[in-house]
Amino acid sequence: MPGLIIDKDDVCFYVTEKCNSNCIMCPMSLDSRKRGNHMNAEEWKSFEESIPGNVSHITITGGEPFLCYERLLPTLKRINLRYPNADILILTNGRALAVSRIMDQLKPLITDRYCFAIPIHGPNEDLHDKITSSPGSFRESITALHQLTDTPARVEVRIVGHKLNLDRINDTLHLLCTLHSRIDVINLIAMEMTGCAARNREFLWVDYDVLCQTAEKGIQYAIMHGIDVGLYNFPLCQVPERLWPLVKHSITPSKIMYSDDCAMCSCRDACGGMFYSTRLLKLCVVKPFGKGE
């Protein structure tokens, strides 16, 4: 449900369940994306006013937050005034940023404290639009990356890895390197196995180690081009040790689960674990490191 999650000086403002894409591996259900809730005006105002004064990081997410752009844009203006030192991360598919009337209103609000995280699912329109089930979405998301070039914002691209795009992961990374001046960070993301991802797991799931090994050439290529690369949602035992510096503790603490076998692992404290849903579906066999390793 839409709402506000406060964790010390970190806030997540979840503004809507609805989305204008229909990604096959979305961790939300189709029903929530198509018939879910926007906040009403009273709820929105109440949650916005509940953001604490000492906040250092604000994440705005959905669904697709720019489906609520008429409320979101004034909120961003107020956030800029009230929390000038807070970093703002906006998780968006970017499609609305290809619309001139929205982008023209958004651009004056963007400061160097902003970061936009936009998913790109493949190196071309055919694959990306197949995954989003939304014709034209690739063109719109790429347009968003170009539009953000003229702003002081940082730009992050997220690639969610699965069987449908596994063979084109390196091509996707190469494409993003051609947009180097527009991209600061690329994060390769392992799926959260809930919602549509869980329902479609038989033809989506790919083992963590296979995903890492397949993408490694493209990852190294991106790093050589000066782009920061991160690995999200990967247990350390599934990642080649040479890529460990890229692994992020990215899973919300309430969603993390460790296998019983992880208790004996010498690297447990350094590992971000796996999603509870992944463990529940028995999709990963962990490989604990011995105390002497």
Task: Locate each region found by the language model.
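Flexible mid-to-C-terminal extensions adjoining Fe-S/redox cofactors in radical SAM and related proteins
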Residues: P240-E293
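Short Fe-S-cluster ligation motifs
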Residues: S46-F66, V286-E293
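Short, electropositive alpha-helical surface patch
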Residues: L73-N80, F116, L166-D184, P240-I256
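N-terminal [4Fe-4S]-dependent radical SAM core
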Residues: M1-C12, G53-N54, R242-S250
